[in-house]
Amino acid sequence: WQYRERISESIRSRTPYKNDIAVRVSQVPEFLHKIEQLVGMSYPDFEIVWFGHIGDGNLHLNILKPAELMAEQFKKQCEQVNDSILLVVQEFGGSVSAEHGIGLLKKGQLRFSRSDKEIDSLKLIKAIFDPDGIMNPGKLL
């Protein structure tokens, strides 16, 4: 377990761009291959480190910054490929947030794994319990 816990620490110096995604366990091999191809075609110098909870399809995708690339440029390039990654998640019927929730950062990404009707239902549920929008402002639930 210590090895798993230290993965994030071991790649921290490489400024990882992170995603917390999930697909069905039976789809994991094909999904990994497709994402590796997608990122490799767009940015062949990017290294990917995968870890997570493979037994339930929860995958932590970490794209590592090449040493010669400035952090701002790396982030911009990762953001450019991120929607394509999320389209693959959508294609596989996966989730854009496997275990860490949606929050403010991933709110715009929810459309890749939930329908408009489902998102509207979440908003409706929140409005029932928080009609004035004072609890968890800006969040769906």
Language model: regions and residue ranges:
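A glycine-rich phosphate-binding loop feature that marks nucleotide/adenosyl-phosphate handling sites
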Residues: 1-2, 51-58, 99-109, 138-141
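C-terminal substrate-recognition/cap domain of FAD-linked oxidoreductases
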Residues: 1-77, 81-84, 88, 92
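Solvent-exposed, flexible loop/coil residues
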Residues: 4, 11, 25-27, 106-108, ...
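A structural signal for short, well-ordered beta-strand segments
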Residues: 19, 61-63, 100, 125, ...
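Generic secondary-structure boundary signal with a strong preference for alpha-helix termini
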Residues: 64, 69, 105, 113-115
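Short amphipathic alpha-helical interaction segments
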Residues: 73-77, 81, 102, 110-113, ...
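Alpha-helix capping/hinge segments and adjacent helical runs
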Residues: 90-102, 127, 131-135
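Activity-critical C-terminal alpha-helical subdomain
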Residues: 107-141
